[in-house]
Amino acid sequence: MAKVLILKSSILGSYSQSSALVDYLNQQWSSKGAQIKVRDLGENTLPMLDGELASGLRGGDNLSERQLSALALSDELVAEIKAHDTIIIAAPMYNFGIPTTLKNWIDLIARAGVTFTYTDTGAVGLIEGKRAIIVTTRGGAHKGGPTDHVVPYLTTVLGFIGINNVETIYAEALNMGPDAAETGISQAKLAIDAITL
């Protein structure tokens, strides 16, 4: 049975188009027997990394309660990744980048010695055998252009921790009129339908 982790990152709640698309994917894959866990980073926000927490994530003695809490949370998030075969990331574009909610998650799971390590030839990811699917929504048309900082960034981060099998589903032009929005959502759903579990 495939184990799937879905990460929602929108701050828009029930109005979120990226969340609606991964909910659609959830329905499709659940009906095929996938075991799915959803973590809503917009609804249950993670702490923003600061100097104290960054120091605490390196471990050591005499950590504060706040550092211990962040370290335990980071361990939990990393364990979630390791426990699932496929990671689905719902990533709306906000001002050409990812939501802060998703950046907070990345800052808690990208840990030297835990999800990647440094060698004489550079960094090596430690998360092996995983697949990631990015479901990205945006108001304009940015795919493949210089204004898309979402997909290149997420692909880089995922590859850095060892997840190089990455697929992307785009829903674009969602604020460029009703017809364009309908087309964007329809094309994204067709792409979801075409993905194998």
Curated annotation (Swiss-Prot):
HAMAP family: Azoreductase_type1. FMN binds at S10, S16, Q17, S18, M93, Y94, N95, F96, T137, R138, G139, G140. The keyword Oxidoreductase applies. Binds 1 FMN per subunit. InterPro entries: Flavodoxin_fold, Flavoprotein-like_sf, FMN-dep_NADH:Q_OxRdtase_AzoR1, NADH:quinone_OxRdtase_FMN_depd. Keywords: Flavoprotein, FMN, NAD, Oxidoreductase. It comes from Shewanella frigidimarina (strain NCIMB 400). Gene3D superfamilies: 3.40.50.360. One of its GO terms (molecular function) is oxidoreductase activity, acting on NAD(P)H as acceptor. Its EC number is 1.6.5.-, 1.7.1.17. Its cofactor is FMN. This is FMN-dependent NADH:quinone oxidoreductase. The gene is azoR. Pfam families: Flavodoxin_2 (PF02525). It catalyses: 2 a quinone + NADH + H(+) = 2 a 1,4-benzosemiquinone + NAD(+); N,N-dimethyl-1,4-phenylenediamine + anthranilate + 2 NAD(+) = 2-(4-dimethylaminophenyl)diazenylbenzoate + 2 NADH + 2 H(+). Belongs to the azoreductase type 1 family. Quinone reductase that provides resistance to thiol-specific stress caused by electrophilic quinones. Also exhibits azoreductase activity. Catalyzes the reductive cleavage of the azo bond in aromatic azo compounds to the corresponding amines. It comes from the Bacteria. Coiled coil: none annotated. Homodimer.
